[in-house]
């Protein structure tokens, strides 16, 4: 996983980059699935306003973390990551935080940045959607995320 400089990202006053960094450190150290799922949940809370249904710019690189968990961490971490991305689909950017400054490509809208990362991971998501391991409980979520990608970003989706 590429190192993310969470402190470099802009956001509202209640965006706490140190919480995102701490969640990533816990995820890297996690051995048990429940530890990894909790770290992913903490990352989700660090990069969004869950109560208002709004995204901070840090949600864009966090999407890569969730996609990596979907691809590599079956069980509770995979489900936590799928749930986060499905919940975010259609959310609005936090007012005043509508763009993400990508260090490689420049400024991008949050929805566009998030969708681009999911689009780039579509092959992996198809494999996960077809994977019956662990009882296959993750399959509907992976299929729904792919369907949402095909439908585009919509306030009604989230």
Give the predicted meaning of each segment:
Residues 107-114, 119-158:
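Eukaryote-biased recognition of C-terminal alpha-helical segments
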Residues 36, 59, 78-82, 139:
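Residue-level detector of extended alpha-helical repeat arrays and alpha-solenoid scaffolds
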Residues 23-24, 66-67, 124-129:
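Buried hydrophobic core positions in alpha-solenoid tandem helical repeats
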Residues 1-37:
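N-terminal "cap/leader" segments of large eukaryotic alpha-helical scaffolds
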Residues 16-21, 55-63, 117-122:
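Core helices of alpha-solenoid repeat scaffolds
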